[in-house]
Amino acid sequence: MEPIVDFKILPERLRQAAQVVTVAVASPADSHTEEVIERSIAEQFARFILVANAAKADIARRLAADYPDKVTLIVAEDDDDAARHAVKEVREGRADVLMKGSLNTDNLLRAVLNKEEGILIKGSVLTHIAVADVPSLNHLLFFTDAAVIPYPTTEQFDALARYITATYRSITGGDRPRVALIHCTEKVSEKFPLTLSYEELKANAANGAYGEVEIGGPMDVKTACDAESGAIKGIASPVVGNAFPDIEAGNTFYKTLTLFGGATVAGMLVGTSAPVVVTSRADTADSKFYSLATACLKAINK
C-alpha cells in the first residue's frame, strides 16, 4: 500500500481499515465539532460517545437523536465533569480516541493528567505532534512540539523523536522517516546548548533507538524542506519530519504554515494511552476533521 502523501487520502484509508474508531468527545457544543462529527459519520470511520455539559447539550442531543446507531450521549454537570467522563471512557477501553469539544484546553488536560484517573502513560512525556498538508510539498510534514513543552530537555527530545517517527509510520504507512533537527545554526556549538542535545539524538538514531530513520541537523527550516537550498549549502537532507528547539519556534511555524503557506494542519497529543485531539478555537473545520482522522488512523495502527 502506497504511503499517504496528503490529507484527502485519509478517509479512504480509514474505510479500508474496516475498523470503526470510537471517539469520546468532551463538551461537543460548537458548530465546528458538530460538523466534524457528522462528516466522520458520513465517511464511515468513526462512532462517538458525546459527553455533554448539561448547560449546553443541544447539539449533542440532536446528534444522538439523528444518529442513534453512531452516537451515545452522556450528560455531565459541567465542563470539568464532561472532561472527567470522556477520559474515563478512554481509560476503561470504551473509546479509542479522546477529542476536545468547546471546553477550555485546561479543563481537558486536568482530567488527562490526573495521577489517579488520567490517561498519561506512566513515565511518558506528554507532547504535541502536528501534521501539515502543504501545497508546495509532495508529502505530509510532521513537526513537534508546537503546544506543550516550552524548552525540551535532552531526555524529552529523545521522547519527541520516538513519538514523531512512530506517528509518521502509523499515519502515512511509510517505513523510513527522515527527521531534521531544526535550529538557527547548522553547527554544533556550546554557545547553543540545544545543538548538543541534537548530537545525542543522532547518536541514539545510529544505535537504532528510533528504528529505520534518517536524522540530520542542526539545520534551518528552508534547508530541511527545500532540496535546492540544501544542495547550495552542501546538505542533502530534505525531510518529512521536523523537531523544533522550543515551543515558541514550533508554534510560530505552525501558525505561519496556515497563514502564509496555505497549509492545512492537523494535530494531536501523544504520550497518552490513546491519541488526544486538542485543536485551537481558531482552527478551521477542515483542520479539526483531519486532526480527528489522523488520530483515528494512529489509534488503528498502534
What does each of the following model-derived ranges do?
Residues 1-302:
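Anion-binding alpha/beta catalytic cores of soluble intermediary-metabolism enzymes, centered on
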